[in-house]
Amino acid sequence: MEKFLDINEIKKIIPHRYPFLLVDKITELEEGKSAVGYKNVTANEYFFNGHFPEEPVMPGVLIIEALAQVGAVAILSKEEFKGKIAYFGGINKAKFRKKVVPGDVLKLSIDLTKIKGVAGVGKAVATVDGKVAAEAELLFVIGK
């Protein structure tokens, strides 16, 4: 189950690139089932220039996107989906519980709960220092 992917290996699986690649490393990967990744949130993030200049907070939508990218790595590691693209198909039950600020290390965990055909559902949780920052149910659709 333990499988480490650095940024270069992540870029071989998902098409995201700077400034929209929001995962620095994957530390756990169970192919087609689950993954855990990390994002080191620094004061140099482009989005802090406008969100918010006097009180920088990582936008919740980008936390969800980071979770979706980890989910994409998990689902695209499944043999039948290798080399394809995972699209964000939907989001349910999103909750934001803690601000994410410069200096935080965002732990991004996803468990794929259902895969049927080219669609999947995952339970996603983002934490900082063991405290839940955001959680949601994410839906994926596999493209070409």
From Swiss-Prot:
SUPFAM superfamilies registered for this protein in UniProt: Thioesterase/thiol ester dehydrase-isomerase
Enumerate the Gene Ontology biological process terms. fatty acid biosynthetic process; lipid A biosynthetic process
Gene behind this protein: fabZ
The main place the protein resides is cytoplasm
Keyword set includes Transmembrane: no
Active site per UniProt: H51
UniProtKB keywords? Cytoplasm, Lipid A biosynthesis, Lipid biosynthesis, Lipid metabolism, Lyase
Keyword Transmembrane helix on entry = no
**Domain of life the protein comes from:** Bacteria
EC number, as in UniProt? 4.2.1.59
What is known about what this protein does? Involved in unsaturated fatty acids biosynthesis. Catalyzes the dehydration of short chain beta-hydroxyacyl-ACPs and long chain saturated and unsaturated beta-hydroxyacyl-ACPs.
Family classification: Belongs to the thioester dehydratase family. FabZ subfamily.
Record-linked Pfam families:
FabA
GO MF term list: (3R)-hydroxyacyl-[acyl-carrier-protein] dehydratase activity
This protein is called 3-hydroxyacyl-[acyl-carrier-protein] dehydratase FabZ
Any one cellular-component term (Gene Ontology): cytoplasm
List cystine links: none
Where does this one sit in the cell? Cytoplasm
Q: Which reaction does it catalyse?
A: a (3R)-hydroxyacyl-[ACP] = a (2E)-enoyl-[ACP] + H2O
